[in-house]
Design a protein with these regions (language model features):
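Hydrophobic helix-and-loop "lid/oligomerization" segment in the mid-to-C-terminal part
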Residues: 1-75, 80-111
């Protein structure tokens, strides 16, 4: 499952963005591990994995320190730490990804 998540990733402004299709028992753990591993992709400063759980879209965010994912996730109603953060959105996967891309754009514009 983790490999499938990583394989779905695309790079946007030095961020790896991936999504988990469907739901499975350990989706939260798989998403977190995938976000960690995606930081190993050359040129990536942050990673984000979107997955559905409990009727919401969750985003697990990781950073190597160059991008403050806490600030990005806080702008979307979440929180966390400089290198590890998350948020939950009451929307669908497509809209969540659009919101994430807007939040990344805003972060880069302001930092």
């Amino acid at each position: 499952q983790k490999a499938a998540i990583i394989n779905s990733s695309e790079i946007y402004r030095k961020c790896a963005i991936a999504h988990a299709d469907g739901t499975f028992s350990n989706i939260r753990v798989a998403a977190s591990k995938a976000a960690d591993e995606m930081l190993e992709i050359s040129g990536v400063n942050a990673s984000f994995v979107l997955y559905e759980l409990g009727g919401q879209v969750n985003i697990s965010a990781r950073s190597l320190g160059r991008y403050n994912v806490q600030v990005i996730m806080e702008s979307m109603g979440g929180g966390g730490h400089h290198e590890m953060a998350a948020c939950q959105l009451n929307t669908d996967m497509d809209d969540a990804k659009k919101q994430l891309i807007s939040a990344i754009d805003e972060y880069i514009r302001n930092n």
